[in-house]
């Protein structure tokens, strides 16, 4: 190691020490007494004490329901999800007679009704034309500064597209619609190409860039562009299409869509709004949860010998809940939802397709483990936390398993979610621009103390605290005793 490298290491150590000291001061300064949140009835996470979301807006884009209102009381019910008033179960059931439904779902969310044959054909033609990324953009933006976290790469690319737009700041409905459709069309290419760039430049693997093909669904094109030989089975494409449909939209209150509303209300451009929503979705408490589920199951498989033994699996789940195993968070990922109580309709549907795919891939033993954990975890969480509300599996529970069976790398788990959710964000952005004329600005109460400004000389002077006085008094007492 050279002298310069040794000096750099020493400087880094010194800097880390400085940050450690600064963080001590930061923690002491920023810690708020938790009792104050109760005293001032703060709706933490914009939820009431029962976990129900505070009403902050209205929407016609989708409806998320986990209760039935009976005699003025909310009674837990099987979960229901509606896109523009149409039950998502009906959308999925309609795909038995047709191959793919994501593009039709995009049209429904954006324009409020299902397209007829002519409308759909025209829409598909438009979306294919909008897909194109120039060779210059791919070379100068996507391929530069490759990143292990594809969500960050997507944010960077989306923000850079602002510079390629001749009219980026116009927030008229016509212009925002154009921008939204372009981003819906381009985001899959950005995600897949960013992943290939990462593999090539960070892992020294072969680089291949394949263009999407006209006449294929988005699900088919993702698999085509992602795989070295571009091959896939009909069931693989079908299951990915279903996953995209189920992730396309989920109300205005989820974190990334609420981010869309908040940022849009400021009057900013579409690219900034979408980049902010991608940043929100990246978080492990939101879109990143599917990867957490996958990692948790890898841990369970490594520590439980008999995956079919209910007692052994249950014992390990208890360890996870007691913060004795996995990431020591005490969380069983993929379980529980802010709205759904008895079931998450997306999870119910995806589970059905996960089973079909597991049969094709010879991974039924793993599927059985997922089913067993699902059957045990909800009751265990409810019992341990003494909850009144039921705890059901959510869509993240099976989505990571599905993606792994499709050969989708973990780096693309959350980007696939972002690709799917882009039409939902777009519909909500247009709804916010059309109906709202106020910037979203909730209240925060100051609970600190007011103090006098001190000059530099006063700040530099040695401060005598109450603790210092106590210590000095104790010292004096000891000295007096010694004299006696």
Where are these regions (language model features)?
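Non-transmembrane, aqueous-exposed alpha-helical and coiled segments at domain scale
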Residues: 2-484
